[in-house]
Amino acid sequence: MVYGELIYHPVVTKLLKFLDSSASREKLLRLLQYLCRFLTFYTFKRNFNIETIQLIKKIQSSIGISRKPLRFLKNLPHLKNLNKIYSNELLDSTLKIGDLIKNFGYALYFQFDTLQWLKLLGLLTSKNSGSLYFKIDKLAANFWLIGLTGSIITDLRNLKISYDSNKALLNEINSQNNNSNNDTLDEKLIEQNNDLILKNNEKINLNKRDLFKNILDSLIALKGSQLIDLNDGVLGFAGIITSIIGIEDIWNATKA
């Protein structure tokens, strides 16, 4: 009886569905990979023995390879989105530019991510790929940074749209409240506007959260692009935070 109640508990059911998704498994592996990256820095600074540091690095490398096949062909949805967004004449121009940059960057990022996988497996070598072999990692980081830049543009634009909408709604409410003729006071309209403001506030919080995540990921991409120099402690911590946010997003989207 207790066993049955546990197995069919809504949280357990949701957890099983969560773990059944390749996206959630990839995010969990990402969390472990960046945790290892942070621990490598921490153990080195704390003068741990070299065997411990090398073990953590080995685990980090193994997890990195394990993540690659879970992202295989992930560029295809972004290529599809490029065509859909480009054809959408009704989309806000700034959002359209941001989404095009985002999907262009991610499409090529995941393409080079696949090449990184082939490189790690030894199927792609300097002999059969020439100078590209030595540029793959940097190019992948470059296109990831481009994708993140597009995401940041859309986040900022969505924030402005929501703030402007709230401002207009508040002005309308104040206009109704300040009307000297109480008979014309539209309580229903005010209530509707308040509901819209609450919905906009929810969007604002989500956009701020996404913006924070994209900025942290940009630090990792900037390091990979060799545009800034940050230690593994900072990068590992940034990766841990963004991985947790990604896991939380997938968990919230999973239906029990």
Curated annotation (Swiss-Prot):
Keywords: Membrane, Peroxisome, Peroxisome biogenesis. It is found in: Peroxisome membrane. It is a peripheral membrane protein. It comes from the Eukaryota. The keyword Protein transport does not apply. Its main location: membrane. Pfam families: PEX11. GO terms for biological process: peroxisome fission; peroxisome organization; signal transduction. The keyword Nucleotide-binding does not apply. Changing residue 73 to S: In strain: S2. One of its GO terms (cellular component) is peroxisomal membrane. Belongs to the peroxin-11 family. Involved in peroxisomal proliferation. Could participate in peroxisomal elongation or fission. May be involved in parceling of peroxisomes into regular quanta. This is Peroxisomal membrane protein PMP30B. It comes from Candida boidinii (Yeast).
